[in-house]
UniProtKB/Swiss-Prot annotation:
GO terms for molecular function: rRNA binding; structural constituent of ribosome. This is Large ribosomal subunit protein uL23. Part of the 50S ribosomal subunit. Contacts protein L29, and trigger factor when it is bound to the ribosome. SUPFAM superfamilies: Ribosomal proteins S24e, L23 and L15e (SSF54189). Transmembrane segments: none annotated. Keywords: Ribonucleoprotein, Ribosomal protein, RNA-binding, rRNA-binding. Belongs to the universal ribosomal protein uL23 family. Coiled coil: none annotated. One of the early assembly proteins it binds 23S rRNA. One of the proteins that surrounds the polypeptide exit tunnel on the outside of the ribosome. Forms the main docking site for trigger factor binding to the ribosome. Pfam families: Ribosomal_L23 (PF00276). The keyword Ribonucleoprotein applies. The gene is rplW. It comes from Saccharopolyspora erythraea (strain ATCC 11635 / DSM 40517 / JCM 4748 / NBRC 13426 / NCIMB 8594 / NRRL 2338).
Length: 99
């Protein structure tokens, strides 16, 4: 059973690299760490109504942070770089490519 698409896509990634990828019709999202590429593709197509051609994923290890009592660790995250088909409409969640 595929979970709700909004449980898979957590948030868009706002960074210099993700804004640069907008011109290549690629969008970067923070996704649930247990999700696979097929689930991510289906979720993006359902939420935004676009056609996805490719999904690349990145597993990022959480940073080690010092606390008052010793060391802790931020949680691990997973990012997905989603490539849309050329005839697909752009996703307006990022505000479009920077001009």
């Amino acid at each position: 059973m595929i979970p709700d698409p909004r449980d898979i896509i957590l948030a868009p990634v706002i960074s210099e690299k993700s804004y640069g990828l907008l011109e290549e019709n690629q969008y970067t999202f923070l996704v649930r760490p247990g999700s696979n590429k097929t689930e991510i593709k289906i979720a993006v197509e359902k939420i935004f109504g676009v056609k996805v051609t490719n999904v690349n994923t990145i597993n990022r290890q959480g940073k080690r942070k010092r606390t008052r009592t010793g060391y802790g660790k931020r949680k691990d995250t997973k990012r997905a770089i989603v490539t849309l088909s050329p005839e697909s409409k752009p996703i307006e969640i990022f505000g479009g490519p920077a001009a």
